[in-house]
Amino acid sequence: MAGLTVRDPAVDRSLRSVFVGNIPYEATEEQLKDIFSEVGPVVSFRLVYDRETGKPKGYGFCEYQDQETALSAMRNLNGREFSGRALRVDNAASEKNKEELKSLGTGAPVIESPYGETISPEDAPESISKAVASLPPEQMFELMKQMKLCVQNSPQEARNMLLQNPQLAYALLQAQVVMRIVDPEIALKILHRQTNIPTLIAGNPQPVHGAGPGSGSNVSMNQQNPQAPQAQSLGGMHVNGAPPLMQASMQGGVPAPGQIPAAVTGPGPGSLAPGGGMQAQVGMPGSGPVSMERGQVPMQDPRAAMQRGSLPANVPTPRGLLGDAPNDPRGGTLLSVTGEVEPRGYLGPPHQGPPMHHVPGHESRGPPPHELRGGPLPEPRPLMAEPRGPMLDQRGPPLDGRGGRDPRGIDARGMEARAMEARGLDARGLEARAMEARAMEARAMEARAMEARAMEVRGMEARGMDTRGPVPGPRGPIPSGMQGPSPINMGAVVPQGSRQVPVMQGTGLQGASIQGGSQPGGFSPGQNQVTPQDHEKAALIMQVLQLTADQIAMLPPEQRQSILILKEQIQKSTGAP
């Protein structure tokens, strides 16, 4: 026995025990103990029972005091008949009895790995997907809900847990795909994208899950990190199938509404729209109503190709609000920009009207301005942009010329004297309220309305025109086709049929000097309610004001004469040199 004590207790016990199989189910441990006592004293006899049913499994273990007795039992009792069955007595340590040996040695059930069976890395994704797919919808939803709470209440612990158990993070992402919280393509990008997971997750895990119904938790952990970076690259990525809202906030790095001011100053985290310059603004609108100052800046940015400085009076702005005229898919009309913004809910509400939309409307109505005018025409775009800036401004409380100076020099309220002065033009004639008329409203801009107005105004509206800036006008005769709904009709494009420059209609702008007695729809400076015609006029005036001497010289004689007359009238009425 001295030698036995040196050995491991479990090994020693196994050597002193025998495995007994093929035991009748009705047999008791006492009956079996009596049988095995025939070869020597029995220390213990244990039947193995099923854990779930509690019924005997048909085998057990008999422990003797020494190994010799155990060997004797195997020789003499193997095949012994009991209740019609031949007992099988074997070495407890034999290969086929390992499971029973473990139970015997430890005296406790075998502990299964909490991670389940071992799987090779390449097979892990498929295995996890199957496991997730096997979950009933209710359980999957509950899992997401619990994970979301975990992330919200203990972000750091949740982060560590997911980092330590990547298979769980993958399973959560897979579950989101199954629940349609995340688009499969986005999920793939997230998986294969290097992101600063710790920072993103730790920072604010909840935003992403919010996207999903009950999920979110996993999204925050797995996707969230990737999503923020992805948003910019993906642009349209709907994280989580996601709620475009999430994307909007994440995409383009567009910050919360409050942050818009910063966005306005710069080009915008990421231009979401193809337009380019304009796009920056589009992203900004996400913020919601913007104060006049902000509104002005955005408008300017697009025209200046995102540059904040005021445009030099002598430098033509080749690109429209949207960016490069030729490349701009939208045709460089404000509408495209507006269209982009509208989804975010930015431009619409603040404008109180279709200010930006008016251009969009045009877009749908006719070919992009570029097409109508031809190569040179893109330049007129800036004209549109100009009116637009002021219009946006109008959304907020009117700003005085100083506070609201647009790069264009347009005052938030309208063409206030100071804004005009910035351009070297006296804006007194164009009063802020005229601008308030929200000339920006797209509907007012309709080409047809404009044509009609242009006809009425003929030379009278010339007054409203100011030589505001070097906005390039049509380089050559404007095609009569331009009269159409083309957004650019407003300024440079004057239908030949209605030779009067539609721009002239701008007289509607109520500058005291600008009002045209014949102008229908003209309103007093004090008027707060603006009619579409007023908007139209304001926009036209803006365009005309931007024509340079060279551009005017390129116009047909009648149009050129009308514009010159307008300029003279404006100068006289405003006292400008």
UniProtKB/Swiss-Prot annotation:
Residues 207-230, 319-409, 509-532 are annotated as: Disordered. The modification Omega-N-methylarginine is found at R308, R468, R475. There is a cross-link at K189 (Glycyl lysine isopeptide (Lys-Gly) (interchain with G-Cter in SUMO2)). It is found in: Nucleus. Residues 514-577 are annotated as: Interaction with RPO2TC1. Residues 360-373 have a biased composition (Basic and acidic residues). Keywords: Isopeptide bond, Methylation, mRNA processing, Nucleus, Phosphoprotein, Repeat, RNA-binding, Ubl conjugation. One of its GO terms (biological process) is mRNA 3'-end processing. Residues 108-248 are annotated as: Interactions with CSTF3 and SYMPK. GO terms for molecular function: mRNA binding. PROSITE patterns: RRM (PS50102). The keyword Nucleus applies. Residues 16-94 form the RRM domain. Sequence repeats lie at residues 410-414, 415-419, 420-424, 425-429, 430-434, 435-439, 440-444, 445-449, 450-454, 455-459, 460-464, 465-469. It comes from the Eukaryota. Pfam families: CSTF2_hinge, CSTF_C, RRM_1. The keyword Ubl conjugation applies. Residues 410-469 are annotated as: 12 X 5 AA tandem repeats of M-E-A-R-[AG]. One of the multiple factors required for polyadenylation and 3'-end cleavage of mammalian pre-mRNAs. This subunit is directly involved in the binding to pre-mRNAs. The CSTF complex is composed of CSTF1 (50 kDa subunit), CSTF2 (64 kDa subunit) and CSTF3 (77 kDa subunit). CSTF2 directly interacts with CSTF3, SYMPK and RPO2TC1. Interacts with HSF1 in heat-stressed cells. Interacts with CPSF2, CPSF3 and FIP1L1. Interacts with DDX1. This is Cleavage stimulation factor subunit 2. The lineage of its organism: Eukaryota, Metazoa, Chordata, Craniata, Vertebrata.
